[in-house]
Amino acid sequence: MMICLPTALLLSAFVVAASGQEAPAGAGASGAAQAPHNPKDCQAILANNGDQQEALLCQLSESSMLLAQLGALVSEGVERLVQTHGLALEEETNEGDNDMEKRKHEYLRFGKRKHEYLRFGKRKHEYLRFGKRKHEYLRFGRK
């Protein structure tokens, strides 16, 4: 993906406007991963129409730095929205409920109760299907 110079300038203007303050060109989260060229050298290379690969490398380093700053701003904004609307607590409670339901269905799905039917017969609540309670079967001697 190639980002041209006007796009990089628009991104930098957006980042400066969104943050409300001017960030130093050498600072940032991606300062260690930045190309060995500093922005002044990149501007000189672009102005002098130097080597095409160096110019592309400079544009790439500048745009990656701007995208990293933009990503940090977006993640900050999302965190603030989550905190103000209280969405983080609801997601945590829903995850616990889903895990319990999944365990219950896995228990039924893999046939864990089949051997129980063979050993013990039907469970208490299954007698209700036939219209009589378990104690009625025991009391009147019917099976």
Curated annotation (Swiss-Prot):
Disulfide bonds: none annotated. Disruption phenotype: Defective forward locomotion whereby sustained long foraging forward movements are replaced with shortened forward runs, more frequent pauses and reversals. Keywords: Amidation, Cell projection, Cleavage on pair of basic residues, Neuropeptide, Repeat, Secreted, Signal. GO terms for cellular component: axon; extracellular region; perikaryon. Residues 1-20 form the signal peptide. GO terms for biological process: neuropeptide signaling pathway. Its main location: secreted. Expressed in RID peptidergic neurons, and the sensory neurons ALA, PDE and PLN. The modification Phenylalanine amide is found at F110, F120, F130, F140. It is found in: Secreted; Perikaryon; Cell projection, Axon. Transmembrane segments: none annotated. It holds the Pfam family FARP. Residues 21-101 form a propeptide. It comes from the Eukaryota. Belongs to the FARP (FMRFamide related peptide) family. FMRFamides and FMRFamide-like peptides are neuropeptides. KHEYLRF-amide has an excitatory effect on dissected pharyngeal myogenic muscle system. Functions in RID peptidergic neurons to promote forward locomotory behavior. This is FMRFamide-like neuropeptides 14. The gene is flp-14.
